[in-house]
Amino acid sequence: MTEKKTAPSFQFMKDESTSVLGGEWVPMYCTDEPVEFSKGDFETAMLNVIREPNINSTAILRADILAEKFYDLEGNEQELSTDDKPVLSESLPYDADAKLVNIDDITTRKELIENKELELTIVKEFVRRMIPRNPYKDALINQTCLVYNSKKTENKDTSLVLYIPHFEDEADCPFYIPHVQKVAILLHGGILSVHYIPYAGQSEDLRKDNERVVRTAFRLLQTAYKHSKGVMQGYEKRVNHDQVVDRVLFQDTYIQLKKKYSKFLVDNWAESTDPKKHVFEDLAIAAFLLEFWKTQYGDDYKTTMQFRDMGCGNGVLTYILISEGVNGVGIDARKRKSWSIYPTEIQRHLKEQVIIPSILLRPTPDVRRYMPYLEDNGAMFPIKVEDGLIAPATLVYSSADLIASPNVNICEFPDNTFIIGNHSDELTCWIPLLGFPFMVIPCCSHDLSGKKVRFNTRVPKSEKTTPAMKNNIKINSNNVNNSNSTYAGLVNHVEYLAKKVGWKVEKEMLRIPSTRNAAIIGTDNAYAKEFPTPDIYRTIEEEGGALTWVQNTMQLAKASPRNH
């Protein structure tokens, strides 16, 4: 039995006065033994880190690649593949209040490596713009990233990655990058190491392992090692974001929304829950929706569509969307304290109503065909009442009563309505069955009667597919995960229901501070004008019916609000 190889330790090189790179370079950390991954693994990992600098710092939102060139060892420029060509954002995520440092300088900065024994030459060069999460606190900067290889055969496995920020003044160095002039990560002789060129008078600090800049060097080495080994082992991302909405567009909109609304919402939070979690989550969802609607309905979407936020809870999402000029309504069975903090015009768009889909109250299409004058199905719904009575009693509501009640929303909306289900609990499985384009972010598992239930993940068998499912061909295969967890089962079940009644489903793993971040989206259904279709009635029946939905949703109106 072979022993499992342990990872090398990282050695602080404080007693070494000179770097293998020569010149002003100061060695910081290195592995104490040769690494097991190859130069190719290292460069693949580091190219990903160049494009995704948020891997190294949570204060960084992303990097925009402004320039990119590849060369052979003789210095001849190589043609970039389509995937490698940089795509610049037309809109920039900042305004007059944002901090900017020399961002007009997009000229690549070169660095000559003085150690002639290495004979290093540039094979890849990038200029990237670093976008911090808060550009009103941390400055945007440009930075050159260089990849060197050796011309010498004996150093064919040597690779160097070098970072040079586009400013000279030490005072301009933002918090989210190492506080030094230049950074190098070197793979040479199987040893992985990190080196700095310090600012004037900084060399002494680089010998103290409790200094932040020294700890940063350790983390840079740790990240380079971890990600290179991951490439070697064939690691693949479990979650792919940005399948539906472009990442840059989403993040730029998120920055703007956060600046406009976060302080007011956090400072005036009226609930007992953590304001930052809810506020920043809903800001991100709003940013996603605004960009999605723009691609779906066009630039004039604010005048051509409207939304209904079903189970809107604290109303934050509704508040942001309406404030951004989108017409819509937030609906919830219970009014929240937070509703009172919003302007009067927003409060008018927040409705305290129980939601009872009209399919439970209206005659079926077959009945209406023979009796078109009928407005309700004549159903009776007994509701037990105990509060304030001498003895428990039962109220009986008719479907006609519920249709006429201003305290009941029966989901009969204008044709241009888009439905949002943001952690809408009992409503989650109902939303794809209402006949309107939708986005639902599942959270807690309930069936169509409103009862808690656990769904198993499943793939519908071909012999059980409905005509609507056969017509549904646009399925995003991005899975939540492969396990049969309660959440994975719920997400899978919502997708199943949506496809079963004809929706062409897309799925996005939203960039929100929540582990329950799967968004199921349906905008195209060949049967939309025929709702409610036979498939919907059949689906409700196959799901066990919804006989107690009315009773459960009435009880929901009396219960205390849940917090997610």
Swiss-Prot record:
Enzyme kind, highest EC tier: transferase
Methyltransferase among keywords: yes
Keyword tRNA processing: yes
Single GO BP term: tRNA nucleoside ribose methylation
Domain of life: Eukaryota
Protein location: Cytoplasm
Catalytic activities: uridine(44) in tRNA(Ser) + S-adenosyl-L-methionine = 2'-O-methyluridine(44) in tRNA(Ser) + S-adenosyl-L-homocysteine + H(+)
Function statement: Probable adenosyl-L-methionine (AdoMet)-dependent tRNA (uracil-O(2)-)-methyltransferase.
Listed name of the protein: tRNA (uracil-O(2)-)-methyltransferase
Major site of localization recorded for this protein: cytoplasm
UniProt-listed Pfam families: AdoMet_MTase
